[in-house]
Amino acid sequence: MPLITGKTKLLGVIGDPVEHSLSPVMHNAVIDHLNLNYIYVPFAVKPEDLRTAIAGLEAIGVVGFNLTIPHKQTIIPLLSTISETAQLVGAVNTVWRTETGWSGTNTDVHGFLAPLKRLNLPWSQVSPVILGNGGAARAVVVGCYEMGCRQISVVGRTKEKLDHFYQSWQNTPIQEALRVYLWEDLPQLVSKTQLLINTTPLGMSPHIDQSPVDLTVMKKLQPGAIAYDLIYTPNPTLFLKEAQQQGAIIIDGLEMLAQQGALALSIWIKQSVPVEIMSQSLRDYLNL
């Protein structure tokens, strides 16, 4: 850990709860590696205190900060500008100081895309199937659209929530590419997709013996398809283990976490960030 002085610049993450965040681990590992005079700390902020907290961060000279649950949407009215990506996702996870106030973006889209882009596939011919229709699914939908996928299928458990999810993309070019399906349609979708993405929490502790996809359905996955789980612990999840048994290429959520963090840190410190240091710090911390 670098020596903290009167010149040390402050970064952080705000959430409720925030004690389980891995952001301080990976950001401080890179700060130490680059020998920067910064420190990254977690701030527990309740929803009703968000406005006061943001004013406080501004007053004490914080350079920038991340947001986690439940603040990714409610922060938006408190910012002077947000990026086009953040507007599409409807959530901000990274904020930095400007002359006109706070600006925000969403680095989850970049984080999600980074491991996929290395595969150099003809993405316009890939029709991803996304499990779940919550906040994480929104970043994945935007990422798939930015990658050039022409048809994006989102699978959920309740028609009302799916309809709301679909309508939320009105007046955006994404809605034309979007299809929504109920869970019972999954067998047919899995058999045809080249990219299956889990954005649900199924498979995380304490439900590590569960998968969002039944094994009978997973057996329909084509060999060589990609299975991507946004969950990073356990590593691998049951979802990824069973996909790998079908001959799938598997991607876990650890690189997405590191890549979105690296982009955020590069915005704040205005220099490139070694993603591999972030990834390794997470693997060391999680004993992976």
Curated annotation (Swiss-Prot):
Keyword Protease: no
Signal peptide positions on this chain: none
Residues annotated as catalytic: K72 (proton acceptor)
Catalytic activity: shikimate + NADP(+) = 3-dehydroshikimate + NADPH + H(+)
Any one cellular-component term (Gene Ontology): cytosol
Molecular-function GO terms, alphabetical: NADP binding; shikimate 3-dehydrogenase (NADP+) activity
Pfam families hit by this protein: SDH_C, Shikimate_dh_N
Source superkingdom: Bacteria
Keywords linked to the UniProt accession: Amino-acid biosynthesis, Aromatic amino acid biosynthesis, NADP, Oxidoreductase
Group of enzyme by EC: oxidoreductase
InterPro entries in the cross-refs: Aminoacid_DH-like_N_sf, NAD(P)-bd_dom_sf, SDH_C, Shikimate_DH, Shikimate_DH-bd_N, Shikimate_DH_fam
EC number(s) given by UniProt: 1.1.1.25
GO biological process: amino acid biosynthetic process; aromatic amino acid family biosynthetic process; chorismate biosynthetic process; shikimate metabolic process
Pathway note: Metabolic intermediate biosynthesis; chorismate biosynthesis; chorismate from D-erythrose 4-phosphate and phosphoenolpyruvate: step 4/7
Subunit structure: Homodimer.
Family (UniProt): Belongs to the shikimate dehydrogenase family.
Function noted in UniProt: Involved in the biosynthesis of the chorismate, which leads to the biosynthesis of aromatic amino acids. Catalyzes the reversible NADPH linked reduction of 3-dehydroshikimate (DHSA) to yield shikimate (SA).
Record-given protein name: Shikimate dehydrogenase (NADP(+))
Organism: Gloeothece citriformis (strain PCC 7424)
Protein's gene: aroE
